Amino acid sequence: MKELTSSQVRQMYLDFFKSKGHSVEPSASLVPVNDPTLLWINSGVATLKKYFDGSVVPENPRITNAQKSIRTNDIENVGKTARHHTMFEMLGNFSIGDYFKNEAIHWAWEFLTGAEWLAFDPEKLYVTVYPKDTEAKRIWRDEVGLSEDHIIDVEDNFWDIGAGPSGPDTEIFYDRGEEFLDIPEDDPENYPGGENERYLEIWNLVFSEFNHTPEDTYEPLPHKNIDTGMGLERVVSIIQDAPTNFETDLFMPIIHAVEALGTNVKYGDAPQTDVSFKVIADHIRALSFAIGDGALPSNEGRGYVLRRLLRRAVMHGKKLGINEAFLYKLVPVVGEIMVSYYPEVLQQKDFIEKVVRTEEERFHETINEGLSMLNEVIKEVKDAKGDTLDGKIIFKLYDTFGFPVELTEEVAEDEGLKVDHAGFETEMEAQRERARSARSKETSMGVQSALLTDIKVESKFVGYTELTHDSELFVIIQGDALVNEASAGTAELIFAETPFYAEMGGQIADRGYVKNTAGEVVANVVDVKKAPNGQFLHKVEVLAPLAEGQIYQLQVDERMRTRILKNHTATHLLHRALKDVLGEHANQAGSLVAPGHLRFDFTHFGQVTSEELARMEAIVNEKIWEAIPVVTIETDIDTAKNMGAMALFGEKYGKEVRVVNIGDYSIELCGGTHVANTEDIGIFKIVSESGIGAGVRRIEAVTSKEAYQLLQEEERQLKEIATLVKSPQLKEVVTKTEQLQQQLRDLQKENEQLAGKLANQQAGDIFKDVKDINGVRYIAAQVNVKDMNQLRQLADQWKQKELSDVLVLATAQDEKVSLLAAMTKDMNGKGLKAGDLIKAIAPKVGGGGGGRPDMAQAGGKNPAGIADALAEVENWLANA
């Protein structure tokens, strides 16, 4: 076996399959692009679903990749097992209807055992096969030459995730030797494929032969596929003779960096601290890559996953004695390890560090909140003479605050309490079940369709230079079938050439007409999409007979196209302006280019200020008024990148690409349609800016006529305001409004002073009405004040004058009730709490509340219940 680094293994794999005619597909973003079914890219095949389900036909049916992936099921096992990770790399080779079992098996064996490649000892390799897959077994035995005792039948060797491609698979295992056997020799699991550490699975070859239909039947696929996956971390652990994946060069530099933080704890000192080192190393890899790909910590979706990973890593840092923000210091270490194939982490190092550090510092504040909650719960348990912390509370601390169960156990043990492990496990299992349900929905692929996939005719787009074009009608599809003619209803058409732009890249499809040679409109074009083999598929409403093989005139709606051109070029200017104002991290996360408006989604950590929006808008308009020529060129992808063209991360580009140059200001890869000069846009106006998800914000804007109409509407509204504030000239509106605001403030201040005097008068009356129950002096009264703030002011007066032991006040405004309860420290010392009192009386007014032992408040919706609430005070005190 050769001595290789992880970088060498990755590159060797890609080089091997490139030599077998495969195209190397770059690793896609961890954040799925145009796939709402996935939370994360979780396998090498996840980015290729469109090829496997037949919705798109690849340029080369042979594909290989090294794909970064994230799986977050069983996060709590990370660090405790030898090979469980949140982020990992999957090496894969794929065939879309090209080669099948024979080549897949032979090439796998060649890569593993060939002297030019990994050079594994063949005697250490075992394979498992599906019992009914006699062909795979025959190839392994008769062609590869494996002995029968190295081929094991396993019933589970059938890959099936619901509707979509499915089929048998064969798995390859490496025998690490008897020293790795972690179960008794006679254990039934002691075999390749069993639950043991001796036989390590390194490669899974899936033979997709069937469509698993929604009706739960299995039908032969029109095109059989190969989908393989080899875990890089596992293979490297074998090559580098590492006991677990964590002792490889993918993780050890991170672990050493944690050791260097000066806590005097070293990796290998103890199993417990080793777990913490592993968790930190694993989680910072996932965080660095995910944030670099545009995901940001939040309380929902993938942002919640990142927040949970970061908090778990911070808590394990505390176990190593690290009590300050430290994870951000590890980001450059991750970047250096992966830079040979994933330069993006180092390229975005500053931004990733900023996000991680900010989140760490916030969590240190949250930890204190969690400890406060835990201490409160412990006190309640002790007050109730209990001895066990409820499992739901433990889970809430774990899930919300990132508290490891062990930490809760330690605190509870110090307080002489036990923990409800069974209750905690019940909550954990419920969460796992929710995750499993989500994954079962996420991972299924569409059922493969043969109709469009088998249409091979070429269809050329001529719409960059023409809006009207005569072309032969090649294909008519109606009712999911190929037909020779159509005379009514809806149909899908493919022409030899077309000026109609198909919906893609955020730009909506053109609309227009199909005319016959007599100039009569025979169909309205209502939508255009790309077919699997790249043809332009026109969805039409048929008005008169259409026949295959005839020549028709295709006419794009010129007015609509012109409006789209302006908005598309404006999005390019806006994209560059965003980066100029907010920073290079502000990447496009989605867009819509329609005739009436444009929408641009972008990644950004934090709010966008009104000043920043104004600067962006000004920059775009300046570029419009500079009358910059917009030049498009067609070139190869490498040349385009060398030109500095901005590629949208996660998008797939072919060998030939279009580069849109707006002078030297903006250079982007784009297949859309654009104006010839920025001055054609006219004017640009931002309509709104908002957050739409974790770390993703949206700008909506208009150009040209729509921008002018918006400005007209804003001017009309301004004139209305001028009339309302009695300002004869628009330029005086601001001054007049400021004067009115000052008058309003003066009146509010005067009103508050009057209200205060009235409250003082009421206080004089109510403070005289002191009642007594069982030696407790109390005041309970309804007062006429406007809000809770004035109730608190009355309570402050009561406290200063020490007029009674207990005070309860109520007020009602606009059908809303406010209640306040206050108690002296003497009452608190006797076990009475204002919070308990308020909880007892609040239901009478249809509400609830709480607070401190000395003061509490509540709200309600039933003013009619105030009298009952105040009467309940005496009952509560009598029984307290």
From Swiss-Prot:
Pfam families: DHHA1 (PF02272), tRNA-synt_2c (PF01411), tRNA_SAD (PF07973). HAMAP family: Ala_tRNA_synth_B. This is Alanine--tRNA ligase. GO terms for cellular component: cytosol. Zn(2+) binds at residues 568, 572, 670, 674. NCBIfam families: alaS. The keyword Metal-binding applies. Belongs to the class-II aminoacyl-tRNA synthetase family. Consists of three domains; the N-terminal catalytic domain, the editing domain and the C-terminal C-Ala domain. The editing domain removes incorrectly charged amino acids, while the C-Ala domain, along with tRNA(Ala), serves as a bridge to cooperatively bring together the editing and aminoacylation centers thus stimulating deacylation of misacylated tRNAs. Binds 1 zinc ion per subunit. It comes from Enterococcus faecalis (strain ATCC 700802 / V583).
